[in-house]
Amino acid sequence: MVLSAADKTNVKAAWSKVGGNAGEFGAEALERMFLGFPTTKTYFPHFDLSHGSAQVKAHGKKVGDALTLAVGHLDDLPGALSNLSDLHAHKLRVDPVNFKVSPGAGLSTLAVHLPNDFTPAVHASLDKFLSTVSTVLTSKYR
């Protein structure tokens, strides 16, 4: 999926509002994913998955940092996320289907925290961005 110039502008503008909360939003998105898709918990058997756990917060920070990196490299998402794609495909062996459900949790989290900025156009751009990130993260499975 190709991000248009308008999509890139929308994504960057929305992400600038996230600011230093990327880790918190990442943790919240993980919690939403675990609640909505309980099978995703199987990849975290060693985690305390309760609300507000230190492990979920720490992993949420990794998610937020990865998305911040991606926002900074919208013209080269495969290059920017190559190592993360390798990690998930070859070491962690996460089922690629799980990457299809994670964008919804991220979109919900952003909509809750950025209600005034979450216009239909921004929603569509963020959806394309998160779906593209998911596609890139599963690209090494092929």
Swiss-Prot record:
One of its GO terms (cellular component) is haptoglobin-hemoglobin complex. InterPro entries: Globin (IPR000971), Globin-like_sf (IPR009050), Globin/Proto (IPR012292), Hemoglobin_a-typ (IPR002338), Hemoglobin_oxygen_transport (IPR050056), Hemoglobin_pi (IPR002339). GO terms for molecular function: haptoglobin binding; heme binding; iron ion binding; organic acid binding; oxygen binding; oxygen carrier activity; peroxidase activity. The keyword Coiled coil does not apply. It comes from the Eukaryota. Keywords: Heme, Iron, Metal-binding, Oxygen transport, Transport. Heme b binds at H88. It holds the Pfam family Globin. Residues 2-142 form the Globin domain. GO terms for biological process: hydrogen peroxide catabolic process. O2 binds at H59. Red blood cells. The keyword rRNA-binding does not apply. PROSITE patterns: GLOBIN. Heterotetramer of two alpha chains and two beta chains. Involved in oxygen transport from the lung to the various peripheral tissues. Belongs to the globin family. This is Hemoglobin subunit alpha-1. The gene is HBA1.
